[in-house]
Amino acid sequence: MTKEEEILNFLSTNVFDPILSSKTASKALKTGVRTTIYRLKQRDAKGMVQYFWAALKGTPRSIKFAELMKKEGVKRFEDVLDEFRERFTKYLK
């Protein structure tokens, strides 16, 4: 498994897949998840980790998306922060 696959697998398992398979998640939320996956796939492992940290730091788009995720009661990047940091920060080097 490549570094990129490892990161995407982790985020898919813990954040993305539960939303995409949810019968109650809004269309806007599912579209946002698909867009995030698309953007992540365009990056190498270092870029994926940087994208994750930028989303947590807050961009205008990521702040609104995180608010929507919170409103709908789904797991967010913030919820997997500790494990993500432990597993993937090494890819920034």
Over which residues does each language-model region extend?
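Short terminal alpha-helical segments
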Residues: 1-32, 81-92
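Short cationic/low-complexity microdomains
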Residues: 2-11, 51-68
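Amphipathic alpha-helical interaction modules
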Residues: 17-60
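Amphipathic alpha-helical binding modules
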Residues: 56-93
